């Protein structure tokens, strides 16, 4: 009962409190031995404190001057007894309010009944005000930030989109969407559509070009013969189809894919960097994904291109030592005896010999391992190089007709290899200082 009285009384009081005057709320608990009414309680408060505290703290004068608010009483009578609360709003300072509260406890009669008054508490009204201010300020601040962030993000997005649109160019006879660095880059990234190019431009990747569908344009075919090509495709069936088309009509060095079920145009910066960092050499990609028919067809097509040249090269390599055996004058006189190189030997200190060997290996799609004396100790297909080196780490130098990838460098370093010579340099993010890496297409 007392709790219900307290709640309802508090509600009434807060409705009547003048927020400009009230600093404290005195809550007095009332007990009487008999039945009394509200006017009896109010009369006792004024009557029994009159003259008790002097003229400066007289309740009637304080109420007239607005220092004390309207006294609210809530009581309930049961079984011949009355209990309840009286609440007195005070605009006095702390000391004066405390004196006034203590004076209320001197009341010993209310109406005709004996009574007891106890101060339950004196509440600082300003604390609640401050708490309400804090809560409201937080809400206002959050609303301001939300609107400010939205505006800021919208402005940044608008400016960025305009910059990206101004950077994208139309390249080749087919007017393909491309990044502004497509003309100057040794390596290019082939994507599916314009939105893919825009998304990569957003994160500063500018050597991109879009094929605009599965019908690969002549411009892309031509570029693939001149540049190191990474195809960066969606993680869906459409990406698979574009890759197959590229393999049939163009040259591909690396494959990067968006996560399954996602498109390049919707990738975040972190996803793009991860996909490009872990791009896979084309032969390894086809092998890992069970695309054996495509791998066979791609290999055969590239071998056919080099068949005649390869035969001439083999002939040149075979005939050259024979010519070196004896240098003969027109008269048939032998002027110099030259030793014949051992089979499988390569002069690793002679750049000309190394470059010719790399050219021959590129046509054979082969990787070779040499010891420190230049003697060949292993030979295997480029696609098997990483696995073979892991299984049997040996030798001093790798000579490969394929691309020098980050994975090959890591494996070679762990195997104790000191030199890697290859045809092209892939996307390298780190290179140990004590391993020598040379790509002939960039060093000659």
Swiss-Prot record:
GO terms for biological process: DNA replication, synthesis of primer. Pfam families: Toprim_4. It comes from the Archaea. GO terms for cellular component: cytoplasm; DNA-directed RNA polymerase complex; exosome (RNase complex); primosome complex. Its EC number is 2.7.7.101. GO terms for molecular function: DNA-directed RNA polymerase activity; metal ion binding; poly(A) binding. It catalyses: ssDNA + n NTP = ssDNA/pppN(pN)n-1 hybrid + (n-1) diphosphate. Keywords: DNA replication, DNA-directed RNA polymerase, Exosome, Magnesium, Metal-binding, Nucleotidyltransferase, Primosome, Transcription, Transferase. Mg(2+) 1 binds at residues 192, 234. Gene3D superfamilies: 3.40.1360.10. Its cofactor is Mg(2+). Forms a ternary complex with MCM helicase and DNA. Component of the archaeal exosome complex. Belongs to the archaeal DnaG primase family. RNA polymerase that catalyzes the synthesis of short RNA molecules used as primers for DNA polymerase during DNA replication. Also part of the exosome, which is a complex involved in RNA degradation. Acts as a poly(A)-binding protein that enhances the interaction between heteromeric, adenine-rich transcripts and the exosome. This is DNA primase DnaG. It comes from Thermoplasma volcanium (strain ATCC 51530 / DSM 4299 / JCM 9571 / NBRC 15438 / GSS1).
